[in-house]
């Protein structure tokens, strides 16, 4: 049985390349997101993704503050690696660390053959006896939040293909084990910006949050997220790929409406790996 600490955080390019001289090449994507709680800006997140053949490496750096850090200042780093296959992502590692307000922590996970094989959380915390335990069987086929966000949605149709919303994603973030059941909601046109390489249309998916284990039944966020029908993710195509990645996320929480919106996306062409 795997015990965890519910750290919260809350891209699928399959065509790697080989240069003519057989040197492996790499594609790099940089996506920036603005994070808000209701109408208040909390900070930003930057995800840098490197892809070579079927391998991926992702690093996310976040900075969140209130009043320029006078009341609150938090920095987070998350990372993931693995492979993208025709059946979906196969993560090998995932990590999340944070530091702020005199507090810090780190979570690390390893995967093998489609299941979690190791979990480390520092500092360790005493498990609440009310917590629903995570079983090893529940971890088979589960993926980490990075793989879930960037490597599950794929389509050759770049114009807001609503078929990318027809899926259920099994997620384990080191604390909670849950399913995200996506379903088509609508297609919307986006305003084109010079700073973004996203396509013109977004597929808007309704998301049903289905908690399975690793949580306390009276957790207020669990209650809000599992009973709302307002969770949305807007998925957009990255030109030149079959990737659909998040452009906009809406997540009701016990503290208010949390949202993340992409402000820019940069795609850099193939280049030799360092």
Task: List each model region and its residues.
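Sec-dependent N-terminal signal peptides of Gram-negative exported proteins
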Residues: 1-20
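Poly-acidic low-complexity segments
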Residues: 3, 66, 144-145
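Acidic, serine/threonine-rich low-complexity disordered tracts
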Residues: 20-113, 157-274
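A charged, solvent-exposed segment within the mature domains of Sec-exported extracytoplasmic proteins
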Residues: 116-179
């Amino acid at each position: 049985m795997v015990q965890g600490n519910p750290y919260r955080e809350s891209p699928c390019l399959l065509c790697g390349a080989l240069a003519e001289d057989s040197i492996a090449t790499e594609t790099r994507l940089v996506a920036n997101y603005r994070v808000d709680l209701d109408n208040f800006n909390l900070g930003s997140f930057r995800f840098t993704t490197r892809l070579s053949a079927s391998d991926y490496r992702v690093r996310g750096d976040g900075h969140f503050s209130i009043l320029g850090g006078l009341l609150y200042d938090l920095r987070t780093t998350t990372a993931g690696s693995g492979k993208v296959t025709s059946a979906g992502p196969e993560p090998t590692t995932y990590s999340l660390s944070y530091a702020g307000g005199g507090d810090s922590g780190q979570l690390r996970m390893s995967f093998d053959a489609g299941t979690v094989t190791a979990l480390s959380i520092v500092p360790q915390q005493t498990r609440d006896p009310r917590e629903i335990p995570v079983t090893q069987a529940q971890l088979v086929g589960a993926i980490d939040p990075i793989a879930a966000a960037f490597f599950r949605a794929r389509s050759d149709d770049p114009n807001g293909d609503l078929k990318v919303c027809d899926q259920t994603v099994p997620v384990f973030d080191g604390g909670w084990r849950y399913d995200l059941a996506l379903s088509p909601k609508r297609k919307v046109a986006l305003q084109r910006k010079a700073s973004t390489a996203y396509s013109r249309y977004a597929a808007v998916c309704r998301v049903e949050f289905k908690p399975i284990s690793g949580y306390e039944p009276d957790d207020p966020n669990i209650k809000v997220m599992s009973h709302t029908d307002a969770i949305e993710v807007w998925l957009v195509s990255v030109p030149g790929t079959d990737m659909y990645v998040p452009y906009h996320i809406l997540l009701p929480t016990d503290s208010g409406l949390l949202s993340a919106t992409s402000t820019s996306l940069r795609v850099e062409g193939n280049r030799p790996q360092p």
